[in-house]
Amino acid sequence: EAPKLPLVVVLDNVRSLHNVGSVFRTADAFRLSGVCLCGITGRPPMVEIHKTALGAEDSVDWEYFEDPLAAVEALRRRGYLIFAVEQVAGSRPLHQLRLSPDQKYALVLGNEVKGVTQSVVDASDAAVEIPQYGTKHSLNVSVSAGIVLWEFAKQLGFSYE
């Protein structure tokens, strides 16, 4: 089995079970170290998650935290840098990030309507956003996860070998 990337996704009160399943599937595709499910985010076993994840919820390590801030604090103690994926003052465009392959990273994705909890944004080491040029200025959570994870995986040395 190939080694896991030093990369974790934190789902902060994501309400759609299809989004949760899709993130599991993407986490499996990029060999992430794990997924943290927080607050109202659904957790396996659930039929709706399984349908979208196609079983990836069994191949990706995951843990549940009632409070997303507790997840961030636990990951920080484990040596992770925390990035909120959110459009906030001071957020950096994804394409401008330069990551170190020797560092562990956690990406926090927020609720479909409210985004990342403000206390989590405040506790994050940085915020990153996907530049957008349309009128909506928002993407589906699982689509955002795929875009950001691709860039992080590429910079952290994801290989097809």
What role is predicted for each listed range?
Residues E1-E161:
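Post-transcriptional modification and biogenesis factors for structured RNAs
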